[in-house]
């Protein structure tokens, strides 16, 4: 017998009451969510499913689980027998199924109760349908929670809040043991979206007919903005489930048939983020009765669609940097990083930015700030979509998901008055006060472009962390999340050095595994996971004051550090606050679309020795491998790193007379750059090792791009926002200063 089953069937009558509510949900196109926590979970789920089948005889079903956990496959097989249209999805591969829409979603939460998975799968449920989450015990035996556990210690503040909110919300069936909590919702409170085709549309009627909401019709027509002459940016934002990617896909099919843009690129953090665009390009071309050719990858991904002289193809963000074309579409732009967007906008005349706001793939709030700044620099049109198409407006489960995962959390509106009260707030205090939690979490998600529901669980459940809050006028305006790391045993250090994960100690893990700094693991440290200030109060020194307070709190601690995705302005902030770069990842983190940097502020003599040695090695690595390992890194960032790291390496020696003569000849225009390339390399290496002159960051970055990274004048210009000629002028000016200083 499968664990969790109960052949007695005594619960059947408890749930034999929902049929009329399920029918009302079909009429109102809203969803139900069922949460079942019970030892006889299978019997309860089966009874609920039987009732649902009375309303929908042949539902499309998605089943989420970890197939390799004990008994999980057996449970899945039992459910599969009940349905004709059944798709089982491994949680780990669920990103591939973004955009799916089905009647019934069943989630096996016996071995995992992870916020990202719950948000993603519940979102696949369409109006009139139901999502079911079942578990024997939501608080124990969960994979993601184990990753937050250290020395057997972990909290359960996130789950308890989740369950408390579930009991209060209408439309949620909560069965805990034999206790049922359920308050019905009503179809009178919902409004289903409908298409609204303009009287004289410029985009073909066949494409408008494929739309499911007036918002989608609006996107089709207003996107024509991008086709007018000159540099233009089109921005499309919406919460999840509004059909923004579908709308852009239909619009691209129109552009292809008109052959307005011959070469269209689509990029996104992962291919699956933008697969709906390609699906709807195909639907659009089919509706227009246009023949096309598909180019697919070995695993079946549609990588390119070609018709006539036009093509749409997907490329990764890294490759998109060096591609050329007529139009580029960046899907899930909020999750891709503002530095990348700056680079794209520098090189492209026609750009479409599509992103989710209030989504589980990353907060769009930082992106919206970015868009507002763009409006003063470029001709920009911003289209907002409000109406959901997967379910009706007013859907109770969307409201619950927004609240339980704080997808729309906003910081309190208060201007800094010069007074800052800084306090250490416990996790328990935070999760007991929902207003405080929303304000604090709102600051975190507004200030950072990469956020997910998992972050909220980490905030509530991971022990060994401090939450420091800065208040002005009694309201939070800044937050710092700190976790204790280090103080490792010899066995733990050996395990990490042999490749075993220990993500609870991120900074020691990276420095032990990749830098082989074994004894660093014995030091006690604090890692600042996140520090954020509300948008209207940034640039006023508040973050720096919070850091100084954290340093004061760090009694008996050897170091305070941070790890983040390499970004020029962020790195400059940490350097300004006395932190030294000691590590830069050699491989790009594809999920975060960037390289990770570690900075450390030494608080003890022991840690200072490590900082000097590690930062010297980092400088040496940058000097030797920027042409290879860090070719795509922002040259300004490389220059900033090398200007703020130590130098233990030997000096380069005197500049040979022939080198001096060659550089002078280049500056005077008598020989081309390639003739003096090795000379320039010698001189810039000597400069960064000795740092005898304060060369401007612009000049240093130009030298880094051309000399150390080996970029062409054109690609160096793209990275720096300059013309090829301007880059060469800066290189000559920089070499002239270096020659005077070091020869």
From Swiss-Prot:
Cite the binding residues for acetyl-CoA.
Answer: 531-533, 538-544
Give any Gene Ontology cellular component: cytoplasm
Q: Where in the cell is it found?
A: Cytoplasm
Q: Show the Gene3D superfamilies listed in the entry.
A: 3.40.50.11040, 3.40.630.30, P-loop containing nucleotide triphosphate hydrolases
The question of whether Acyltransferase is a record keyword is answered with yes
Q: Where does ATP bind?
A: 216, 241-250, 390
**InterPro entries recorded:** Acyl_CoA_acyltransferase (IPR016181), GNAT_dom (IPR000182), NAT10/TcmA_helicase (IPR007807), P-loop_NTPase (IPR027417), TmcA/NAT10/Kre33 (IPR032672), TmcA_N (IPR013562), tRNA_acetyltr_TmcA (IPR024914)
Alphabetically, the GO molecular function entries are: 18S rRNA cytidine N-acetyltransferase activity; ATP binding; tRNA binding; tRNA N4-acetyltransferase activity
Q: Which GO biological process entries does UniProt record here?
A: rRNA acetylation involved in maturation of SSU-rRNA; tRNA acetylation; tRNA wobble cytosine modification
**According to its UniProt record, which protein family does this protein belong to?**
Belongs to the RNA cytidine acetyltransferase family. TmcA subfamily.
Q: Could you tell me what this protein is called?
A: tRNA(Met) cytidine acetyltransferase TmcA
Task: Tell me the classification of the organism that encodes this protein.
Answer: Archaea, Thermoproteota, Thermoprotei, Sulfolobales, Sulfolobaceae
């Amino acid at each position: 017998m499968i664990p969790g089953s109960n052949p007695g069937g005594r619960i059947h009558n408890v749930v034999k009451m929902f049929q009329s509510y399920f029918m009302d949900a079909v009429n109102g196109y809203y969803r139900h969510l069922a949460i079942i926590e019970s030892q006889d979970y299978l019997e309860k789920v089966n009874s609920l499913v039987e009732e649902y089948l009375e309303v929908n005889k042949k539902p499309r079903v998605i089943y989420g689980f970890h197939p390799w956990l004990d008994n999980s496959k057996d449970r899945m097989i039992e459910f599969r027998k009940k349905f004709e249209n059944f798709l089982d999805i491994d949680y780990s591969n669920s990103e591939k199924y973004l955009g799916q829409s089905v009647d019934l979603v069943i989630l096996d939460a016996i071995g995992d109760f992870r916020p990202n998975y719950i948000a993603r799968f519940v979102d696949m449920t369409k109006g009139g349908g139901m999502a079911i989450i079942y578990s024997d015990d939501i608080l124990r035996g969960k994979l993601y929670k184990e990753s937050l556990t250290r020395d057997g210690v972990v909290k359960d503040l996130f789950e308890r809040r989740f369950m408390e909110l579930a009991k209060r919300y209408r439309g949620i069936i909560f069965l805990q043991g034999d206790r049922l909590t359920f308050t019905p919702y009503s179809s009178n409170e919902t409004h289903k979206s409908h298409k609204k085709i303009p009287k004289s549309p410029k985009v073909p009627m066949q494409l408008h007919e494929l739309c499911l909401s007036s918002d989608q019709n609006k996107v089709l027509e207003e996107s024509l903005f991008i086709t007018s002459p000159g540099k233009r940016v089109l921005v499309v934002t919406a919460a999840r489930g509004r059909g923004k990617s579908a709308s852009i896909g239909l619009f691209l099919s129109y552009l292809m048939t008109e052959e307005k843009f011959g070469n269209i690129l689509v990029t996104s953090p992962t291919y699956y983020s933008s697969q709906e665009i390609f699906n709807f390009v195909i639907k659009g071309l089919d509706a227009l009765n246009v023949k096309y050719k598909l180019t697919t990858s070995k695993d079946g991904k549609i990588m390119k669609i070609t018709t006539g002289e036009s093509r749409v193809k997907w490329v990764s963000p890294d490759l998109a940097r060096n591609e050329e074309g007529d139009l580029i579409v960046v899907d899930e732009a909020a999750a891709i990083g503002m530095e990348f967007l700056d680079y794209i906008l520098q090189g492209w005349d026609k750009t479409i930015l599509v992103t989710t706001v209030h989504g589980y793939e990353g907060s769009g709030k930082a992106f919206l700030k970015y868009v507002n700044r763009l409006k003063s620099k470029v001709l920009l049109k911003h289209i907002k979509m409000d109406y959901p198409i997967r379910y009706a407006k007013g859907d109770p489960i969307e409201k619950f998901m927004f609240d339980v995962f704080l997808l729309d959390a906003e910081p309190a509106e208060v201007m800094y008055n010069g007074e800052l009260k800084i306090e250490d707030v416990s996790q328990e205090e935070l999760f007991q006060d929902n207003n405080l939690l929303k304000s604090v979490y709102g600051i975190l998600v507004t200030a950072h472009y990469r956020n997910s529901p998992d972050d909220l669980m980490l905030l509530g459940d991971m022990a060994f962390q401090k939450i420091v809050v800065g208040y002005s006028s009694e309201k939070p305006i800044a937050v710092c999340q700190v976790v204790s790391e280090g103080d490792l045993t010899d066995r733990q250090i050996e395990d990490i050095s042999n490749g075993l994960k220990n993500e609870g100690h991120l900074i020691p893990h990276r420095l032990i595994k990749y830098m082989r700094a074994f004894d660093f693991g014995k030091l006690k440290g604090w890692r600042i996971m996140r520090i954020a200030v509300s948008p209207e109060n940034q640039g006023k020194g508040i973050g720096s004051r919070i850091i100084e307070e954290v340093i004061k709190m760090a009694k008996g601690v050897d170091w305070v550090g941070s790890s983040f995705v390499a970004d020029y302005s962020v790195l400059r902030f940490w350097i300004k606050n006395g932190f030294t770069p000691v590590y830069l990842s050699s491989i790009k983190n594809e999920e975060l679309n960037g390289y990770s940097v570690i900075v450390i502020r030494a608080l003890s003599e022991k840690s200072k020795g490590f900082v000097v040695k590690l930062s010297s090695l980092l400088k040496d690595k940058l000097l030797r491998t920027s042409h290879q390992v860090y070719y795509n890194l922002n040259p300004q960032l490389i220059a900033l790193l090398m200007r703020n790291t130590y130098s233990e390496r030997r000096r380069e020696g005197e500049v040979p007379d022939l080198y001096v003569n060659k550089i002078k000849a280049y500056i005077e225009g008598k020989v081309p750059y390639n003739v003096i390339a090795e000379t320039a390399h010698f001189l810039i290496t000597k400069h960064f090792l000795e740092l005898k002159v304060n060369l401007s960051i612009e000049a240093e970055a130009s030298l880094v791009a051309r000399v150390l990274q080996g970029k062409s004048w054109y690609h160096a210009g793209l990275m720096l926002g300059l013309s090829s000629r301007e880059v060469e002028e800066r290189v000559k000016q920089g070499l002239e200063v270096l020659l005077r200083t070091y020869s």
